[in-house]
């Protein structure tokens, strides 16, 4: 994948975050790697409010690319075969739960470092009040 496409995918993920999507997934030929240079960009979006769909699509259309977007907003009514295809071939661009997990891991790491620092300070530096 070239740098321009990676940058575009980061911008798509940022739009997903802005609209509080649960997940944004690249699927289709670009996810599988069998795309042509002019292939469209298939994007599946999970967990966006139906009221936000037009604005989400508008922001995608403003991205700096000549490529077309094929956008699927996944709901409970989405064809199960399509969802299975997205799950099988998809490349996750943004996942809210994964990002929360990564932040938790970072916080635990910082806490571990703080505990080590505290232990190295010794009890003499602890004051009451």
Language-model features and meaning:
Residues 39-41:
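Periplasmic OmpA-like peptidoglycan-binding domain that tethers envelope proteins to the cell wall
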Residues 1-23, 31-37, 48-129:
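Catalytic core of pol beta-like nucleotidyltransferases
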Residues 44-46:
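Short hydrophobic/aromatic beta-strand micro-patches
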């Amino acid at each position: 994948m070239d740098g321009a496409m990676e940058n575009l995918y980061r911008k798509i993920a940022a739009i997903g975050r802005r609209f509080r999507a649960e997940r944004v997934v690249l699927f289709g030929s670009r996810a599988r790697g069998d795309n042509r240079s002019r292939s469209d960009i298939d994007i599946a979006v999970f967990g966006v409010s139906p009221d936000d769909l037009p604005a989400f699509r508008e922001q995608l259309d403003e991205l700096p690319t000549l490529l077309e977007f094929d956008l699927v907003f996944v709901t409970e009514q989405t064809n199960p075969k399509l969802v299975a295809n997205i799950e099988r071939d998809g490349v996750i661009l943004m996942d809210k739960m994964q990002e929360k997990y990564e932040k938790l891991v970072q916080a635990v790491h910082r806490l571990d470092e703080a505990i080590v620092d505290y232990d190295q300070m010794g009890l003499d530096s602890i004051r009451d009040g």
